[in-house]
């Protein structure tokens, strides 16, 4: 088994808001994603949502206030909490979610997540 170089994986694609699976463990997917602009308001009824900023800055809008994340910072959105990620400039983010979790809360989007 070899290590995973996240910067190398991130260099393989340029699209935004399309998570790519880089590893899996205990029924969870470890993903990297490039983000820029505003995503959509959504929630996950059955799971928390883990965000860790690898590069840049990310704001996670919540209905009761915003969470601002810088490089090296993380935040977990509790299950059922509506949120909307925003990045003014391109940011690189690490996500960890149960395998097959839709990135918008809509089951159709789970099928669009690919592995690198």
Task: Please report, for each region that a protein language model flagged, where it lies by residue.
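Short acidic-glycine-tyrosine-enriched beta hairpin
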Residues: 63-80
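A short glycine-rich, His/Asp/Glu-containing loop-to-beta-strand
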Residues: 6-41, 47, 105
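Short glycine-/acidic-enriched loop or helix-start segments at secondary-structure transitions
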Residues: 62-63, 71, 87, 105
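A cytosolic small-molecule/anion-sensing beta-strand core signal
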Residues: 26, 54-55, 70-71, 89
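Short, conserved beta-strand element in jelly-roll/cupin
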Residues: 34-35, 44-61, 96
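Double-stranded beta-helix
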Residues: 2-10, 23, 88-116
């Amino acid at each position: 088994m070899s290590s995973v170089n996240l910067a190398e994986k991130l260099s393989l694609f340029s699209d935004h808001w399309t998570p790519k699976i880089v590893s899996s463990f205990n029924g969870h997917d470890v993903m990297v994603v490039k983000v820029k602009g505003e995503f959509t308001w959504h929630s996950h009824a059955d799971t928390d949502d883990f965000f860790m900023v690898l590069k840049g800055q990310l704001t996670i809008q919540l209905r009761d206030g915003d969470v601002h994340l810088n490089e090296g910072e993380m935040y977990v959105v509790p299950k059922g909490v509506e949120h909307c990620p925003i990045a003014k400039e391109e940011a690189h983010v690490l996500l960890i979610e149960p395998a097959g979790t839709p990135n918008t809360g809509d089951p159709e989007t789970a099928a669009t997540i690919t592995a690198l």
